Amino acid sequence: MDSGSRYPGAFIHRTALVEADSIGEGTRVWAFCNLLPGSRIGRNCQICDRVFIETGAVLGDNVTVKCGASIWNGITLEDGVFVGPGVAFTNDPHPRSGSHLAEYPRTLVKEWASLGAGAIVLPGVRIGRYAMIGAGAVVTADIEDFALVVGNPGRRIGWVCVCGEQLIDAGDVLGCRAGCRRSYRRSEGGIALAGGSADPRSA
């Protein structure tokens, strides 16, 4: 099917089952996706094949969710988040078959963070802006802005630029390995952008 009158300006593949409360203009929902009532999707998102989005999930603008990922109740993805194929979010710390929580823990993925293929995110964590979660990593605790995280349990092994490349640590000032002209300074609890664009789509 095309976007239809319910979601003007969006594209919905004819095999997708879509009952979301809202889908923004320019968003594309591909084959065999299931978007439940009570979910909300922003503008210009890419929801790839076989993605499941549950009631209560919220996606901002320009979000990409690759094939086979599941986004559950209590999970919010801010603008520009990238979710790799097969990423598994969880929303119940002590699950039992047939039991349901009155309120699910809130998991927040901040703007432009990226989660690599097969990463697992445990309930109630906050993943910071521009953070990069490596493929297969298990996120068990909050992650700082710009952190590069790998392993099980996930641990920070460095910092990444707005553009996604790893930063070169030169003391108080850090620079991008790719030479994108952004610079960073150390701040309490992590690093902060000191110069250059905060938009990954620009140099």
Describe every region a protein language model picked out:
Residues 182-199:
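Short metal-binding segments enriched for Cys and/or His
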Residues 5-150, 154-156:
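Structural signal for interior beta-strand "rungs" in well-ordered beta-sheet cores
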Residues 1-8, 197-203:
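Short, low-complexity, intrinsically disordered N-terminal peptides in bacterial proteins
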Residues 173, 188, 201-203:
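Intrinsically disordered, low-complexity terminal tails/loops enriched in metal-binding residues
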Residues 145-152, 160-171:
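Short, intrinsically disordered, charge-biased short linear motifs at domain edges
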Residues 87, 155-158, 165, 191:
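Flexible, active-site-adjacent loop/turn segments at secondary-structure boundaries
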